[in-house]
Design a protein with these regions (language model features):
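Non-catalytic C-terminal accessory region of glycerolipid acyltransferases
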Residues: 2, 92-199
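Catalytic core of membrane glycerolipid acyltransferases/transacylases, capturing the structured
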Residues: 3-9, 16, 29-88, 96
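Short gly/ser/thr-rich secondary-structure transition/capping motifs
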Residues: 16-24, 88, 142
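A generic structural signal for alpha->beta connector loops
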Residues: 18-20, 57, 78, 104, ...
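A generic local structural motif
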Residues: 20-26, 45-47, 94-96, 126, ...
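Secondary-structure boundary/capping signal
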Residues: 22-23, 58, 139, 198
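Short, flexible active-site-adjacent loop segments at beta-strand->alpha-helix junctions, enriched
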Residues: 27, 41-42, 54, 64-66, ...
Length: 199
């Protein structure tokens, strides 16, 4: 955690000439339990911007290829990220995600599964609600929006919404029907912050 704080400060200094990150919190967030933050996905910079905006350490899943890059792999692992094999139903990554939440951490997930630059919210994959089902954790909808400008100090707005309590998700098990319904609630939360239609 100490390394994370130092690294976050260094990143803030390095990126200051290029990005102005603004955070908005729509509600008071849980302090003494783990939960899942789920956001739209626009850019490779999203984990960094969300990390700068958020008041606690975020533990992100990251594609496994990044961990094979010398130096970078060690840095992102030290910052608390862990690998996921995309498109393979990676059970080890799910287990790691569950452990983050059960240990009282905040898990960061991009449920769309990949980046989209069209300003819309796309169909969500089930990873976030699967972890919620396994842990009893709440879901925190979030969104990230980049100002469309080419010059220095691009404005980045990060909005953290109202947590969706686990009891409202209706997850008595892991049936496809329950997961779809819970995903719909999460999509509504993210889409509402973005001001777009629910996929």
């Amino acid at each position: 955690m100490a390394f994370y704080g130092v690294a976050k400060r260094i990143v803030q200094v390095v990126l200051w000439p290029f990005y102005k990150v603004e955070a908005e919190y729509r509600a008071e967030l849980p302090q003494n339990k783990g939960y899942i933050m789920a956001s739209n996905h626009v850019s490779d910079m999203d984990p960094v911007m969300l990390g700068l905006a958020f008041h606690k350490q975020l533990r992100f899943m990251a594609k496994e290829e990044l961990f094979k890059i010398p130096v970078l792999g060690r840095i992102i692992r030290a910052l608390g990220a862990f690998p996921v094999a995309r498109g393979k139903g990676d059970q080890t990554a799910i287990q790691n995600a569950v452990k983050v939440v059960e240990d009282g951490g905040v898990l960061g997930i991009f449920p769309e599964g990949t980046r989209f630059k069209d300003g819309k919210l796309h169909r969500l994959k089930s990873g976030a609600v699967v972890v919620a089902s396994k842990t009893g954790a709440d879901l925190l909808p979030a969104c990230i929006q980049y100002e469309k400008r080419r010059f220095l100090r691009k404005r980045v707005k990060v909005t953290f919404g109202i947590p969706i309590e686990n009891s409202a998700l209706g997850l008595t098990g892991q049936s496809k029907t329950e997961l779809r319904a819970a995903n719909k609630l999460l999509a509504q939360g993210i889409a509402g912050l973005l001001g777009v239609e629910v996929p």
